Amino acid sequence: HCRLRRQRQMCIRDRYKNAQMTTSIRNITIIAHVDHGKTTLIDNLMKQSGSFRENEVVDERLMDSGELEKERGITILAKPASINWKDSRINIIDTPGHRDFAAEVERVLSMADGALLLIDSAEGVMPQTKFVLAKALKQGLKPIVVINKLDKADQRADEVLNETFDLFVSLDANEEQLDFPVIYASGRSGWASNEIDGPRENLNPLLDLVIDHVKPAEFDKSKPFAMLSTLLYADSFLGRSLVGRISQGTAKANQQIKAINLDGEKVDEGRSTKIFRYEGTKKVPIEVGEAGDIVVIAGLEKANVADTICDTEVDTPIQATPIDPPTMSIKITVNSSPLAGTEGKKLT
């Protein structure tokens, strides 16, 4: 047992060592209307890119890990994953498609260098498509349009492409954004093609398009470490875990760090007890996280979303994108009316 455990640990270390030698990182988010196939597409991207062992049992909709997500069949929380393709690592962020969870989409766009805009080839442009695309364009992202579910009998890919172009124009996209690449796919069947009637073999054309079209952002690794906290997870062992893209410098395990809010006030200070990176859907521990990568940091119990996690010598917070205020707010308090307690017993 000990020998097998040591061999397994050596294999894992070799994997991580090789992963750290990747030449570039692409951070992309997948945005779409609800039920247009984001999570199913990611499932097949992970399987075809070799993220799982041959003998590993893989669930459907593996990104939907929450009980409520599995029960409802929808994505509620944004979640990162990672795949290695050729000489690059692609961090993929799955986002909710339902408008009730739109704030999740807004937050994760700040971590992305590019976006895949998925559109159902039969349903076409839907209300949430417009919302998420507007947010992506405002961030300056240049989306790749994926016309999905092309295996449907009632697909109308050409019309949907025209609808999509009209949507870009109506949202005041610039010339670079209007010159968006298009690829046709079936996430469920696991293929993508540059032409409607092109070969339908695998998802390699989509991964190649991501590498060619999404340029990795440039970061200064010589500056002190700083990262905008974008997602927050609770861990029964490590406590509060903060997810974000490192904006500058490098994050190291057991490094003295602090959290500052948008006003530059210190919220918390401590040591980064653990640093993780995503390999597939799993979190794997690393010693050093570099600028541009999406990492998970544990060790700060008071830090929150939109706080800047940084080296102790950093004083300037990273500006977070303001999230749209709620359409309606409700305040529930104790009934302090003079007539409180005088209601009748029969309530119906």
Describe each PLM feature range.
Residues 13-348:
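Structural and coupling elements of P-loop NTPases
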Residues 1-14:
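Single conserved hydrophobic/aromatic residue that forms the stacking wall/gate
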